C-alpha cells in the first residue's frame, strides 16, 4: 500500500451562475435601485438615473458584488476601445490616402475622412496632395501604421476586422464573468498573483512580443521604405517571419540565429539593437533600432519584476509585509493598515492609479515632441500640436479624477476608529499646517508670477523697454533649466559614454534635423519669457492642488462642519438652518478644481503652441537658414499680458476667423459653436435654483390652463446638478474652442 501525502486543496475562486441573464430586467430603467425603478414622479428622476447607474456603491454594500460589477464593466470598456480602434483602421482602409502618403510623406498630408456632398459641405474636402481631396487628420495613425510595417490597405482591413472580433470577445467576457463564472472577492484581493500576472503578461510579454514584431516585421519594412522602395515591391510581413534568409540579407547577424545569445556574444546583435540617441535624419523620428532595444530591455525588466511576489510557492515579496515594514523615524506606524485600505476600497486604489496614470500621460505629452517616436511625425506640425494638447487635457482630467476618488474613499470607505498614527492619520492630523502653507505658496506664486507680467506691461505702456524683464534688458534667465539642458546635451561622451548623441535634440548642441525642407527638431533655447510663463505654470498647478487636496483632507470633517462625513460626498449646503456652508462638500472641491485644472492646462498648451511656432517649427533653405513660422517672436512678445493677447490669441486666431469659404470653414463654425456652448455654461453657473423653480411653476400654470400639463412634474435642476451641467459645458466649450483655434491655425500655416 502506498501512503501519499494529502493533495493540497484547490481553491475554487469562482461562483457558477450567480446572477441570471434577464433582458426583461435590463429593459426596466433604474432596475438597480428600488427608488428609481418605481418610475418618474418628477423630472429629477432622469438625473438620478444617470447619476446612480454606474455608482455601484449605491446599488449594494456587498464588496464582492461591487467588485464583480467593476470587473465586468472593464470588459465593456475594452470592447468600446476595440470598436473605436476598428473604426480608425477601417477609415484608414476605406476612406484614406494612406498608400499615397506612404509613397511621399513629406509632400502629401494624411487624410482619412471624405465629406459627402449634401448641402455643399464638400468644400471641407481640401487638397491634401497626390490628387486626393479630404479632411486632413492629425491623430498620428498614419505615422504609427508606417512604423509598425503596414504597407497596404488590405492589412488595415484585416486589422479592423480583427479588432471587431476582439470587441465581441470582450463583450462576451464581460457577460461571462458576471453571469456565468463570477470571481470571488478573494480573487480580486490576491494582489501578489495580480502583480505577477500583470507585470509578466501585460508589460513583460507585451513588450517582448512588440520587440519581436519590430525586429522581424517593422525594421526590414521600414528599411525598404526609407530607401524609397515602392511599398508594393516590399515582401509581406509573413515572408520576413518565415524566411530568415530575407532578414539575413539586410542584417547578416540573423544568419547565426540564437547562437550569439546563448554564447553571450551579444554585440553581434548590435545591428538592430542600438544605442544611438537623437533622430533618424531620413524620417525625423527616433531610430527604430533604439526603440527595439528599449522594448527588449523593458520586457526583461518586467519579466523579472513579474516573478518577485509570493504566491503558492512561498518565495518572494509579500505586499502586506513590505508596507508594514515601511516605517520612518517621523511617520509613526508608517504604512501599517494601508494594505487593508487598498484591498477593500477600490476608490483608494483607483485614486492612486489615476494620479500615476495622469502624471504619466503628461510625461507622454512632453516626450511626443521632444523624442518623436514615429517616422514623419516631427514634421507633421498639426499632429504634433494635437498630440501634445490631447495628452495634456487627458492628464489633467485623470489627476482631478484621482482627487475625486480619494475624497470618495475618505467619505465612504475610511474608518477612523481603526486608523491610529499611521501615515494617513498623521497627514489628516496636521492638515491645517499643510493647507495653510500651500495657501501661502499659492498667494506668493500668484502675486509674484503675475506681478512680473504687470511690471512689464506697465513699463511697455510707459515706453520704458530698458526697464522690462526681458532677454535684452533686465534678464531673468532660467539658469537651473539651462543647466539641466546642458548636462543632458553633454551626456554622450561623459555620463553616457555608449550613446552617440543625447536623448533629445531639444537639450542643446549644434544638431538640427530637417526632413523635406521642414524642421523636425532643434535645440530649444530657454530665456526670460520661459522663466515668466513657467512661474504661471507653478502658480496654476499649486492652486489646483490646493483646491483638490483641501477637498480630500477635509472630506470627512472641518471646523465649520464637524459632521461632514454624515452628509456624504456631494451636498449643496449644510441644511437650511446654517448660512455660509455652501460649496463645502468634497464634490464641490472637485467641481472647483476642474476650473483650475482648465486654467493650468490652457496656459501650458498656449505656451507650447506659441513657443514651437516661434523657436522650433519652420522651413529651412538650401543655404541652411531656418525661417520659423512666427519668426522667433516668443522671447520679446510673450513677456507682457498684452503680448499674449495681441501676438498669440488675436494674431493667430486670424486663420480660424477667416476660414469661411475654405476647406477649414468647419473649424470656423466649431469656433463659433464652442464659444456658444461655453457661454451657455454661465447660465447654469451664475443663477440659483430658486430662480428656475419659480419660472418653471409659471410655465406649468400655463400648461395646466391649456390642459397639456405632463404627468411627470417638472422640477428645476438641483444645485449640484446645475453645477455639474455648468462645469461640463464650460470645459467642453472651452476645449472645443481651443481645438478649432489651434487646428485652423496650424493646418493653414504648418
Curated annotation (Swiss-Prot):
- The UniProt annotation places chlorophyll a binding at 683, 691
Alphabetically, the GO molecular function entries are: 4 iron, 4 sulfur cluster binding; chlorophyll binding; electron transfer activity; magnesium ion binding; oxidoreductase activity
- Note the coiled coil stretches, chain numbering: none
Positions contributing to [4Fe-4S] cluster binding: 573, 582
Q: Which residues cross the membrane?
A: 70-93, 156-179, 195-219, 291-309, 346-369, 385-411, 433-455, 531-549, 589-610, 664-686, 724-744
Similarity remark: Belongs to the PsaA/PsaB family.
Tell me the protein's name.
Photosystem I P700 chlorophyll a apoprotein A1
Q: What lineage is this protein's organism placed in?
A: Eukaryota, Viridiplantae, Streptophyta, Embryophyta, Tracheophyta
Primary gene name = psaA
Amino acid at each position: 500500500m502506498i501512503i501519499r501525502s494529502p493533495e493540497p486543496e484547490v481553491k475554487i475562486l469562482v461562483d457558477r451562475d450567480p446572477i441570471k441573464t434577464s433582458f426583461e430586467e435590463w429593459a426596466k430603467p433604474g432596475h438597480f435601485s428600488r427608488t428609481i425603478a418605481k418610475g418618474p414622479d418628477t423630472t429629477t428622476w432622469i438625473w438620478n438615473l444617470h447619476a446612480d447607474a454606474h455608482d455601484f456603491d449605491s446599488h449594494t454594500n456587498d464588496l464582492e458584488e461591487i467588485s464583480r460589477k467593476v470587473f465586468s464593466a472593464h470588459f465593456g470598456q475594452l470592447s468600446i476601445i476595440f470598436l473605436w480602434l476598428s473604426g480608425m483602421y477601417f477609415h484608414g482602409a476605406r476612406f484614406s490616402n494612406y498608400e499615397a502618403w506612404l509613397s511621399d510623406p513629406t509632400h502629401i498630408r494624411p487624410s482619412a475622412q471624405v465629406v459627402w456632398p449634401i448641402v455643399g459641405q464638400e468644400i471641407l474636402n481640401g487638397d491634401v496632395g497626390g490628387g486626393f481631396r479630404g479632411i486632413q487628420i492629425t491623430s498620428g495613425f498614419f505615422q504609427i501604421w508606417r512604423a509598425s510595417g503596414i504597407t497596404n490597405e488590405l492589412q488595415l482591413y484585416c486589422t479592423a476586422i480583427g479588432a471587431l472580433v476582439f470587441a465581441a470577445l470582450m463583450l462576451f467576457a464581460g457577460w461571462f464573468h458576471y453571469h456565468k463564472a463570477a470571481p470571488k472577492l478573494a480573487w480580486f484581493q490576491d494582489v501578489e498573483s495580480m502583480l505577477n500576472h500583470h507585470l509578466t503578461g501585460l508589460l513583460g510579454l507585451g513588450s517582448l512580443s512588440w520587440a519581436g514584431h519590430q525586429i522581424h516585421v517593422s525594421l526590414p519594412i521600414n528599411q525598404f521604405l526609407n530607401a524609397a522602395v515602392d511599398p508594393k515591391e516590399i515582401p509581406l510581413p509573413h515572408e520576413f517571419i518565415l524566411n530568415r534568409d530575407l532578414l539575413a540579407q539586410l542584417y547578416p547577424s540573423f544568419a547565426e540565429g540564437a547562437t550569439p545569445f546563448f554564447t553571450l556574444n551579444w554585440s553581434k546583435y548590435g545591428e538592430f539593437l542600438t544605442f544611438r540617441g537623437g533622430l533618424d535624419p531620413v524620417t525625423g523620428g527616433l531610430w527604430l533600432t533604439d526603440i527595439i532595444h528599449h522594448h527588449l530591455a523593458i520586457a526583461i525588466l518586467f519579466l523579472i519584476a513579474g516573478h518577485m511576489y509570493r504566491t503558492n510557492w512561498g518565495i518572494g515579496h509579500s505586499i502586506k509585509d513590505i508596507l508594514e515594514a515601511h516605517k520612518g523615524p517621523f511617520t509613526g506606524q508608517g504604512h501599517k493598515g494601508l494594505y487593508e485600505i487598498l484591498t477593500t476600497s477600490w476608490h483608494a486604489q483607483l485614486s492612486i492609479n489615476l494620479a500615476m496614470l495622469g502624471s504619466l500621460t503628461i510625461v507622454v505629452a512632453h516626450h511626443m515632441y521632444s523624442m518623436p517616436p514615429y517616422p514623419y511625425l516631427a514634421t507633421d506640425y498639426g499632429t504634433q500640436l494635437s498630440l501634445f494638447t490631447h495628452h495634456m487635457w487627458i492628464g489633467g482630467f485623470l489627476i482631478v479624477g484621482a482627487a475625486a476618488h480619494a475624497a470618495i474613499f475618505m467619505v465612504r470607505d475610511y474608518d477612523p476608529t481603526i486608523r491610529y498614527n499611521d501615515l494617513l492619520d498623521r497627514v489628516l492630523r496636521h492638515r491645517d499646517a499643510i493647507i495653510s502653507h500651500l495657501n501661502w505658496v499659492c498667494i506668493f506664486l500668484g502675486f509674484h508670477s503675475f506681478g512680473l507680467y504687470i511690471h512689464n506691461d506697465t513699463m511697455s505702456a510707459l515706453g520704458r523697454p530698458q526697464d522690462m524683464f526681458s532677454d535684452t534688458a533686465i534678464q531673468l534667465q532660467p539658469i537651473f533649466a539651462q543647466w539641466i539642458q546642458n548636462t543632458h546635451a553633454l551626456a554622450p561622451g561623459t555620463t553616457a559614454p555608449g550613446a552617440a548623441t543625447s536623448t533629445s535634440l531639444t537639450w542643446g548642441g549644434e544638431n538640427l534635423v530637417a526632413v523635406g525642407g521642414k524642421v523636425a527638431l532643434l535645440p530649444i533655447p530657454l530665456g526670460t519669457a520661459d522663466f515668466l510663463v513657467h512661474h504661471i505654470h507653478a502658480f496654476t498647478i499649486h492652486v489646483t492642488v490646493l483646491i483638490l487636496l483641501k477637498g480630500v483632507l477635509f472630506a470627512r470633517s472641518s471646523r465649520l462642519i464637524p459632521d461632514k462625513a454624515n452628509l456624504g460626498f456631494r451636498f449643496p449646503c449644510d441644511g437650511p438652518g446654517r448660512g455660509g456652508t455652501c460649496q463645502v462638500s468634497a464634490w464641490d472641491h472637485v467641481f472647483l478644481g476642474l476650473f483650475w485644472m482648465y486654467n493650468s492646462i490652457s496656459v501650458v498648451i498656449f505656451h507650447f503652441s506659441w513657443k514651437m511656432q516661434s523657436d522650433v517649427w519652420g522651413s529651412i533653405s538650401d543655404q541652411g537658414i531656418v525661417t520659423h513660422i512666427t519668426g522667433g517672436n516668443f522671447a520679446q512678445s510673450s513677456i507682457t499680458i498684452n503680448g499674449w493677447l495681441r501676438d498669440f490669441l488675436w494674431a493667430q486666431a486670424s486663420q480660424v476667423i477667416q476660414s469661411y469659404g475654405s476647406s477649414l470653414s468647419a473649424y470656423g463654425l466649431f469656433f463659433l459653436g464652442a464659444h456658444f456652448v461655453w457661454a451657455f455654461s454661465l447660465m447654469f453657473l451664475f443663477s440659483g435654483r430658486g430662480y428656475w423653480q419659480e419660472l418653471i411653476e409659471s410655465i406649468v400654470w400655463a400648461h395646466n390652463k391649456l390642459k397639456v400639463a405632463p404627468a411627470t412634474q417638472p422640477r428645476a435642476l438641483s444645485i449640484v446638478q446645475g453645477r455639474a451641467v455648468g462645469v461640463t459645458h464650460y470645459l467642453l466649450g472651452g476645449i472645443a474652442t481651443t481645438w478649432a483655434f489651434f487646428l485652423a491655425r496650424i493646418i493653414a500655416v504648418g
